[in-house]
Amino acid sequence: MALLDFFLSRKKSTANIAKERLQIIVAERRRGDNEPHYLPQLKRDLLEVISKYVQIDPEMLSVQLEKKDGDISILELNVTLPETEETTK
């Protein structure tokens, strides 16, 4: 019976298709808006300051902003510093 229903089923209306597409677009935009616009510049500035003191690969710096419970934001900064070879005196 399912096979018969498949062949006799009506096509989705264009309104339903448009609604589904809009829901997908809205969901993608909400997901993409989590990162503030200033975060890439903040990462560049931090990299510039750290580079004054230590040679560091840009891939070794990670900056993430996580929002929790509406009002709370957590800025996470991970820096992997290169190992230094200490010379004995």
Curated annotation (Swiss-Prot):
Residues making up the signal peptide according to the UniProt record: none
Tell me the superkingdom of the source: Bacteria
Keywords in alphabetical order = Cell cycle, Cell division
The record's section on InterPro entries has:
MinE (IPR005527), MinE_sf (IPR036707)
Q: Which Pfam families match?
A: MinE
**GO BP of this protein:** cell division; regulation of division septum assembly
Function of the molecule: Prevents the cell division inhibition by proteins MinC and MinD at internal division sites while permitting inhibition at polar sites. This ensures cell division at the proper site by restricting the formation of a division septum at the midpoint of the long axis of the cell.
Q: Family membership, please give it.
A: Belongs to the MinE family.
Q: What is this protein called?
A: Cell division topological specificity factor
Q: What is the lineage of its organism?
A: Bacteria, Pseudomonadati, Pseudomonadota, Gammaproteobacteria, Enterobacterales
